[in-house]
Amino acid sequence: METLLAILAGMILMSSLVKVGLLPMKVRLVVAVCYAAFMGWVTSHMTELSHEVFVQLATDRSIMLDLAVCVILEAVVMMTYCFCSPKQKVWGVLLEYEPVLLAIPALCYFQAQLLYGLPGVDYAWVAWMSAGLVLFLMLGGPLLLRWLLRERHLLLELLFIINLLIVVLCVAITGYS
């Protein structure tokens, strides 16, 4: 189960990376700074919880079902954006600036894994190093994707495929738990 959750969180972050790559540079900068600041801020709250709390949350079936519903709804919104964006109808414009909200819990998941995986390391150092890494990846990753996939419709197809895999993974997680 832990492996499936890690893969799901990674896919959600990849989806947010592709989605941020479709935004204008100013918006990308704001999103990257917000994600990085969140990574630095959330560490003090996460250190108050023990690792067993995270394990209990991951093994509780009702929480996993609620999480699956939220993830599937977010993926459907992203897939709707993929269909509406090329036509630039009202929905495409509205969904363009809709942030990937599930990137925040995915970042929390990886921050918790990092904090509990590095015992004896200063939490503040881990927090701000991970914030710097998130800032670098959220600014550099979309530029790399735009350079590799040059055309907007290829980025939209990649976003659609990633979100389709997220939906399949959510179905697998709910069936597994």
Task: Tell me the role of every PLM-derived stretch.
Residues 18-31, 83-94, 145-155:
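Membrane-interface helix-boundary motifs at transmembrane edges
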Residues 49-84:
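Alpha-helical transmembrane-segment detector that highlights a single hydrophobic TM helix
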Residues 77-140:
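Membrane-proximal helix-loop-helix units in multi-pass membrane proteins
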Residues 3-22:
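N-terminal signal-anchor/start-transfer transmembrane helix
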Residues 46-60, 114-124, 174-177:
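Membrane-interface helix termini and inter-helical loops of multi-pass transporters
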Residues 124-129, 141-177:
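C-terminal transmembrane helix-loop-helix hairpin of multi-pass membrane proteins
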Residues 42-47, 106-114, 165-177:
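Hydrophobic alpha-helical transmembrane segments in multi-pass integral membrane proteins
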Residues 28-51, 105:
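A generic, lipid-embedded transmembrane alpha helix
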